[in-house]
């Protein structure tokens, strides 16, 4: 019996890493909710209610600094400090506002993708189109309200895959995607999540050519997974697809091979720091509760004093028997856990974690600061390059559903590109002055000088376009 829920061995191997990164990036509440998974219980052999209560207090006092999540957000912010370049034909205009059918624009989809790459080193892009007849013109296309969509898939949701050699090319021949669909209850308010599996295949037709098919599996009445009707999508020209419009996206390359997440070492250190914090906060708790003691007394004195009230402090008389004494016992401070935590904090900063720490920049030389940025951006650059390539490929697949000949679309007419200029230079008055002087001399355009003054960045245009602007300004035809 076939089992659509079968998980690829590499998926099973990497799933714990992905789940750990999700928890750590989500923050303190998610980490603490997992209890002993990330914070082992002292005296775990003791199953008494008292020890359970002690562990809950130990867990509550622990402090989890959200370093990994902050680093991830910072790197995503660096990648999108400059707006991505997005070019598309009119048939794909909807992608600018709703790329996945759930309201996410292409920009937001790209941001989510970079975040997944940093956490999981992997995500999937899949393009589909409603099962309708291809429109013959743009007006008919808009009337149908059927648009190609680009779906971004979490690595956790792509549970199985396989590839084969076809015509001397390695192609994906199987992709199994776990999905959840919502169904509203009869009361109109309640909602249930129903699991299903979407299977993308390359399979031979009657002539031996491999074509793309889609089949959805749902749980039947007997609890077994039942495959629905197979669909064989076609492009705008009515031709079957000879490959699956799906790609894995990775931080090293876009192959199906899985690498370790780039934030995993930082997450492990973050959790180790969390455990040190728990021990340190435990010692702080006990240090803050000194124990009073009395010696040279008996129970009769204690009972009598208790009736009258025992008061300790300035201007208070406490009669003691002969040779009696009163004192305070306090636990010795445990500096070992604090020192271990501080060591790990420094290690996290050395690993390129972007901590929101005011004044930290003053403790670093320019070389050290640039080195930290280089470490982060070398990882981020790889993520961005591969995401750009995958998103541009997905755009071409989407275009193939609605345009007769996608080969005529060049990079100037169809592309998505996240900028790799992660460090904004910022506005420089001297540079603005030089641009103005160059414009006066006819070696640059006033348009470029104006845009730099407004944004602090050079306009993104080709040399030929700048030449046209200069000539237009000289002969008075510039559209300023």
Segments the model singles out, each with a brief description of its role:
Residues 1-158, 478-480:
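Extended, helix-rich architectural segments
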Residues 100-119, 253-260, 264-267, 271, ...:
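Generic amphipathic alpha-helical segments used as scaffolds and interaction surfaces in large
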Residues 29, 36, 46-56, 334-337, ...:
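Hydrophobic alpha-helical segments and helix-packing faces
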Residues 78, 82, 102-109, 116-124, ...:
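Short secondary-structure junctions and interdomain/linker hinges
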Residues 118-251:
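Extended, regular secondary-structure scaffolds
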Residues 226-367:
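Extended, charged amphipathic alpha-helical segments
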Residues 317, 343-480:
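C-terminal helix-loop subdomains that flank or include functional centers
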Residues 17, 91, 110, 262-269, ...:
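Alpha-helical structural motif
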């Amino acid at each position: 019996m076939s089992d659509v829920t079968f998980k690829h061995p590499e998926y099973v191997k990497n799933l714990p890493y992905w789940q750990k990164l999700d928890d750590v990036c989500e923050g303190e509440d998610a980490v603490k909710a997992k209890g002993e998974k990330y914070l082992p219980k002292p005296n775990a052999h003791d199953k008494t209610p008292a020890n359970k209560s002690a562990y809950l207090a130990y867990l509550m006092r622990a402090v989890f600094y959200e370093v990994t999540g902050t680093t991830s957000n910072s790197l995503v912010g660096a990648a999108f400090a400059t707006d991505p370049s997005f070019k598309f034909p009119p048939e794909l205009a909807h992608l600018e506002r709703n790329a996945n059918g759930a309201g996410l624009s292409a920009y937001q989809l790209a941001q989510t993708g970079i975040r997944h790459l940093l956490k999981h080193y992997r995500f999937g892009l899949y393009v589909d189109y409603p099962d309708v007849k291809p429109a013959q013109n743009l007006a008919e296309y808009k009337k149908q309200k059927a648009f190609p969509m680009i779906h971004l898939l979490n690595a956790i949701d792509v549970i199985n895959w396989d590839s084969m050699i076809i015509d001397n090319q390695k192609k994906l021949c199987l992709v199994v995607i776990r999905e959840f669909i919502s169904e509203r209850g009869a009361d109109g308010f309640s909602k249930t999540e129903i699991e299903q599996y979407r299977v993308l295949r390359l399979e031979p037709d009657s002539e031996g050519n491999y074509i793309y098919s889609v089949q959805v599996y749902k749980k039947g009445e007997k609890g077994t997974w039942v495959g629905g009707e197979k669909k064989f999508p076609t492009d705008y020209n009515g031709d079957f697809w000879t490959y699956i419009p799906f790609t894995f996206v990775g931080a090293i390359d876009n192959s199906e091979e899985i690498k370790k997440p780039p934030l995993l070492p930082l997450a492990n250190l973050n959790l180790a720091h969390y455990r040190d914090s728990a021990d340190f906060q435990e010692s702080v708790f006990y240090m803050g509760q000194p124990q009073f003691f009395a010696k040279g007394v008996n129970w009769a004195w204690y009972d009598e004093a208790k009736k009258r009230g025992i008061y300790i402090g300035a201007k208070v008389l406490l009669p003691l028997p002969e040779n009696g004494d009163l004192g305070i016992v306090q636990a010795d401070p445990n500096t070992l856990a604090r020192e271990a935590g501080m060591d790990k904090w420094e290690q996290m900063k050395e690993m390129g974690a972007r901590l929101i720490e005011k004044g930290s920049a003053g403790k670093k030389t320019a070389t050290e600061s640039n080195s930290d940025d280089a470490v982060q951006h070398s990882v981020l650059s790889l993520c961005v390059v591969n995401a750009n390539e995958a998103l541009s490929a997905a755009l071409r697949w989407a275009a193939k559903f609605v345009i007769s000949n996608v080969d005529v679309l060049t990079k100037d007419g169809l592309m998505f590109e996240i900028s790799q200029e992660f460090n904004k230079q910022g506005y420089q008055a001297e540079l603005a002055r030089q641009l103005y002087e160059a414009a006066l001399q006819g070696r640059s355009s006033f348009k470029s000088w104006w845009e730099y003054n407004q944004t602090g960045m050079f306009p993104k245009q080709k040399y030929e376009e700048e030449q046209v602007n200069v000539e237009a300004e000289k002969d008075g035809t510039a559209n300023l």
